[in-house]
Amino acid sequence: DTTVAVTGADVALRINGRVRALWCSHRLGRGDSIELGHAESGMWAYLAVAGGFGAKAFFGSTSVVLREGLGEAIQTGQQLTCGESTETEWAMPRESIPLLVPAPVLRVTEGGQKAEFSAAARDVFFGSEFAVSQQSNRMGCRLNGPAIASPSGERLSEGTTYGTIQVPPNGQPIVLLNDRQTIGGYPKLGVVLSLDCWKLAQCRPGATVSFKSITVEEAQDLVRTERAARENLTLRRGGEGGVQQG
């Protein structure tokens, strides 16, 4: 036996043909089946199993990064091993489940080459809506919208971080995500707050986003508040939380 949970996008979860709640753990035995329907909202759903999947680890992680040749793509019919579990079924409290909202406003701490961008370029960035491009992936989210005047001139490549906002010569910003490259040479306007990056990752192509500037101190306070909320989170018995989908 093992325990599984499905979170993320708003999908319909069925176990052995019965509709079950998201954001809850569910006990499974040999021969049980899981079916995920199309997402009503959001881009990615996550299937978690107790103890993780049995796969070769690279740098302490079993995540697959095909671009770097780390791991392999899952094939139809492939069998994955997972850990056993006899845990009680638990559920995330409904009030603690992240909400998938349309047209999210992403908070940004300005930095990088901020001083090299004109005031007009900053006004365009923070005063406009941008659409998620079809070319987005786990490496980064490309955005389409009003062109932002990018500083000219050569510069040395430097380290990138989760949420870094690069502005290439075409003026269309790129927000770097989990599979980002380690260094980059495009001018950087700032960094999307780490707490907001998942909102961008869950946006489908064509969805719109906008940006709001916050201070480093405000960002630190928001992260501390979120960390405290997670540390004080109390799961509920299965059936007393989660989100039921049809």
Language model features with spans:
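Conserved "landmark" site that anchors the functional core of diverse proteins
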Residues: 1-246
